[in-house]
Amino acid sequence: MISRYTRKAVPQSVELKGLTKHALNHHPLPERLDDISSTNNSHGKDTSSHSESDITQESPITSTDTGNSNSRSAFPSYAGTGVSTEGSSDFSWGYGELDQNATEKVQAMFTAIDELLYEQQLSAHTQGLQKECQQWAASFPHLRILGRQIITPSEGYGLYPRSPSAVSASHEATLSQERESTIFGIRGKKLHFSSSYKPSPTIKASGLCAVGGEEADCIIFSEGVIEEYLAFDHTDMEEGFHGNKSEAATEKQKLGYPPIAPFHCMKEDVLAHVFDNVWSKAVGCMEQLTRSHWEGCASDDESNVEITRLDSGSPYVLNEQHPLVLPRVPQSKVPSITSSPMSFCQASGHQPNVSGLLIHGMPLQPRNLSLMDKLLDLDDKLLTRPGSSSVLSNRNWPNRAMELSTSSLSYTTQSARRRNPPPRTLHPISTSHSRAGTPWPVEEILRGPRVPVTADTLSSPSPMTLGRNNLLPPIGTVEVEHLSAMGPQRPTKSHGDSSRARSAVVDEPNQQPQERLLLPVFSRPNTTQSFLPDTQYRSSCASEYPHQARPGRGSAGPQSHGSTKPQSRGGPISRTRQ
């Protein structure tokens, strides 16, 4: 047994030189070849002789000195299988004979099939094959052999015959007599993915049990729940619509399936091409309109007219009229802007916007301007009536002062300018005129111990400061002449006295009281004379000399202007230096 593993395969050249006799001595030849050939002759003489001739021609040992039968029997497996080591094995003779018999039978079967299909020759094997095919067709109706296979089948596809006579039931029943043997193909049951396809009744086999047209719904055995996820191009849409093809088509479009059919592809391409052209034109028109509108708002009137003019040669410009350019707003409806830079910017900012819009040219007014005008007009009516100054009590003044102080300075000056033609600013008073309007004994009294009391009362303003708005009784001209004669006696005086003299003189009668309160830069400062207990004398000083305030302000020099300016900002602290 050990020597089996040391043997090598005998080459073909050595076998041809005479080693076959040595192999024959160890393995005597049994006479079985004649028995095999006799069994083949019982089935058909022509088939066995033809198969033996084919095997003999294919055998590579036909050139040996021995006969054809001896060479095949010496190496039976080499002629059939090609394994050369089986000739030297003790147990290989039986295996080789079985392989040889099986090979010869299969080869004879294929030869008979080829003769039947291509040469129309009938034999014993061919008759057996026909009976077997009929049994297969009756037992397995889903797969039948009809003829020649044209294309390679794939899952989900079916082959259609060239003529309807090829799939008739009579041809299936009598397959060996009536069917066309030149056509070879595989026909099976088609999966009905489309609802428009109606299965033909000729597809059903004759040997099947009558199911009544529900062959696809027949369930042989089922257990449990099976879920299948299939992906295919076309869905059965008539299950929910019951034959309404229009609703099925609309529902298919809503499902979002990609356009597979050539018609849908062409439709989508045409729509995309048309949409691109229309959208490009629409974007061009919108670009022209937007550019003309916004550039017109940012530029002045002359450049605005040039930019907003439509270009007739542009392909994106529609046939429409030019935008309406509204006229300028009359100056009577525009508030005065000469005194306030903020109002000038606001009024000039509205003018370019009007030219590009189809709106009425109304200048925007501030929110508090109408309220201020109403309050100021109410004050004018109350002041012009006799005895109406007492109506302006302390409960109205502080609230209105807080409300009007938050507004802009330009709005107050504009409303005052419309009512008061004279200038609003208070120019500094010269020293000579200020001395002429204030008596000397009053200045000596103001220098006294009343200054600390004034500093204390300025921290919390007293309602007595509003008392000078009341109407004053008339004063005789004798006292006026006496006081005017006493004025020029003291021409040289300090700046503190000049400020007191200026504070003793009331502003112009046309100037309103609220302007003096809200405009501290342009009005005179509060002094200690406002808090004197002698109201009668203070009122006489305030009302007797309105004619001396104007020439004093008009002839003021730069020296007096510089001296009074810091005093008006400093308050009572700067007046106590002397």
From Swiss-Prot:
One biological process term in Gene Ontology: cilium assembly
Keywords, sorted A to Z: Cell projection, Cilium, Cilium biogenesis/degradation
Biased composition (Basic and acidic residues): 43-53
Composition bias, Polar residues: 54-74, 524-542, 557-567
Subcellular location: Cell projection, Cilium
Region (Disordered): 22-81, 410-439, 486-578
InterPro entries from the UniProt entry: DUF3719, FAM149
Cellular component terms per the entry's GO annotation: cilium
Top-level taxon: Eukaryota
Pfam families: DUF3719
Predominant subcellular localization, coarse grouping: other
Function: Involved in the localization of proteins to the cilium and cilium assembly. Indirectly regulates the signaling functions of the cilium, being required for normal SHH/smoothened signaling and proper development.
Complexes and interactors: Interacts with TBC1D32; may play a role in cilium assembly.
Recorded family membership: Belongs to the FAM149 family.
UniProt-recorded name of the protein: Primary cilium assembly protein FAM149B1
Organism field: Mus musculus (Mouse)
